[in-house]
């Protein structure tokens, strides 16, 4: 029985977690650090199960590409309408600045309203991240309610991936790789280079997980906050490179001095928010008793 369960989980992972050939966002160390810290934000009733699942979650949070609901599926459902023809190669971003100036009020937060205004193809092209978070919050709730602990682990990892992605400022902008501002690679220097070099020296300060009343709306607030840091990071990158011909240690020391506080803030908030989404799904499922492992 145990071997059959393990085989089923591995089969699900083979389907769900496919590495993307070209992708942007937090580096592997950041994803794992945030997920590890998120476990410790949970209430006592959830801790034993998630502590036992910690290694699984940390291992599988990076770059899952699950079979996603159709672009015009309602948040919280996976129903695929018959006229859907839009492929979704990657949905862990939303390029908010396509929709006008901050705070992007031209983009409806209601999915059906957004489709009516812009069409499915446009939404798919410029990213579905907040709605995907809503979808996978519901999927995790359903897994908790069904006592399907294998699916709980899988959906918790997928949900964590999307929530973490929402805290990377470069997942929220058309200038996702810095080329538009003539700063190619600034995204990787911020979300991977700084983490890899300095994570042992900064303190990730998390808060206890809290209940999220509207997972999709809260996801929009997360990406808005992340987007507000794009310009300060770009400015820090430009200043750090003044007088230098490369992006080596002198550059990174300068960059961290100017943008390190933003990085630590985003990592800390991401860990708290991942835990909050997990707890919210559990509460919405009726607070089922979780197995200890």
Language model features with spans:
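Bacterial N-terminal signal peptides
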Residues: 10-19
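Alpha-helical and His/Cys-centered functional microenvironments
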Residues: 10, 35, 167, 171
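N-terminal, motif-rich segments that launch catalysis or mediate targeting to/interaction with membranes
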Residues: 19-158, 174-250, 254-268, 272-293
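Bacterial N-terminal signal peptides that target proteins for export
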Residues: 1-11
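Catalytic Zn2+-binding segment of zinc metalloproteases
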Residues: 164-178
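Extended, hydrophobic/aromatic-rich amphipathic alpha-helical segments that build helical scaffolds
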Residues: 157-165
